[in-house]
Amino acid sequence: MAHARDPTGAEIARFIATRTGAQMVQLMRCIKEPAAQAAFTAKLLVVPPAVSGRPATPEKARKALNAFVGFRCYYVTIPMFKSWPMKKLSNLIGLLWEADPNKSLWSLMAKAWSTIRDQIGKDQAPLDQFFRIICPHLKLPDPASYLEIHGWILTVNEEGDPTISRSADSEFVSIGTGNTDVALSVEDIITYVQSLGYAHGFILDDNKPSSTFLGQSVSSTLEKNTSAISVTQATPNAAHARFLVRNKRRAKRQAVRNASYRASLDQDILIAHQFNPAPVDEHMPDCHSNTAPVLDQCHNPSPNQFYDGITTLLSDQIPTGQGDAGHLDNAHLFNDYSLPGDVSFITIDDFTTNMPNLIDYDAFRLGADEDVALPIFDDITHI
């Protein structure tokens, strides 16, 4: 049988440290002697805070430093900018950033500093000190000479605000990363700044591959300068040449469209008049006028059979003395204007006609005999 023993001081301290507020109040009530209460209260003052059983909430990942923000933090110290507040310099620094040729380097430096900050904190990794160490190593222009190297001119407008413009004859190049072929990574930047005493508390994981890597082939400054100038001069000429070639292609396509429209219109006109179509590429002369018939002037083409048939049909109904001379004098002709329109021609005495194929259609008159024999249409094929 185990014997009861008194708890040690460490066990008592651990027991008290793990009690809740309600349990501590209950313990105070159980102590009756004033001296014991005073001793217990003094003990509570030196007890460490209670440890919660809940897991600690993981710290939210910080947002990586933006490359433009890093560029602005470094070049806002340009000596010529000291006369104006930051709100008047924001637009100028934005213009400098848009034309800066080393954006890839600034992105790599921002990634390296963000990696250091996330591990040891911002207080242990000052941003301005980081740029003062790494920018000269990468041969980036210092703030005092940046405007001059890149051909920027600072002026003051009528309102007293600063403005910048680039001189037309300036010869600026992408300056940075030395004069040799380089391959740069985030780890390379961190290793270099640590070698100069920056961020001693940062521990680099050698087993983790680099997530950001910059490969860049850089020739001599003279070769870069010559290449930049030649590209700058060749760009307007090449753009102008492309513009001329494009306009020439458009003019050629438009000429083909116009020719096809004219040929199609000429073809439609010929088909409408039932002429023999002329060749597509042959120009159709405007030979007719407003005073002369078209058929008489356009080389006298063959008459239209459709119009001739209509003319013959209408002219046959006109009474002519020469055509009716063979009939009796007292005979009533079919095309005689004196005949009433509501009288059957067949029932008229001495009816005669100069139309041999006339068919009696009296059976179709209103009130006609239903039993009358209908005429046979010989020109219709019976099925």
Curated annotation (Swiss-Prot):
<dbReference type="GO" id="GO:0007338">
    <property type="term" value="P:single fertilization"/>
</dbReference>
<keyword id="KW-0539">Nucleus</keyword>
<protein>
    <recommendedName>
        <fullName>Mating-type protein MAT-1</fullName>
    </recommendedName>
</protein>
<dbReference type="GO" id="GO:0008301">
    <property type="term" value="F:DNA binding, bending"/>
</dbReference>
<dbReference type="GO" id="GO:0045895">
    <property type="term" value="P:positive regulation of mating-type specific transcription, DNA-templated"/>
</dbReference>
<dbReference type="InterPro" id="IPR006856">
    <property type="entry name" value="MATalpha_HMGbox"/>
</dbReference>
<dbReference type="Pfam" id="PF04769">
    <property type="entry name" value="MATalpha_HMGbox"/>
</dbReference>
<keyword id="KW-0278">Fertilization</keyword>
<comment type="function">
    <text>Mating type proteins are sequence specific DNA-binding proteins that act as master switches in fungal differentiation by controlling gene expression in a cell type-specific fashion. Transcriptional activator that induces the transcription of alpha-specific genes.</text>
</comment>
<dbReference type="GO" id="GO:0005634">
    <property type="term" value="C:nucleus"/>
</dbReference>
<keyword id="KW-0804">Transcription</keyword>
<keyword id="KW-0805">Transcription regulation</keyword>
<comment type="similarity">
    <text>Belongs to the MATALPHA1 family.</text>
</comment>
<feature type="DNA-binding region" description="Alpha box">
    <location>
        <begin position="60"/>
        <end position="117"/>
    </location>
</feature>
<keyword id="KW-0238">DNA-binding</keyword>
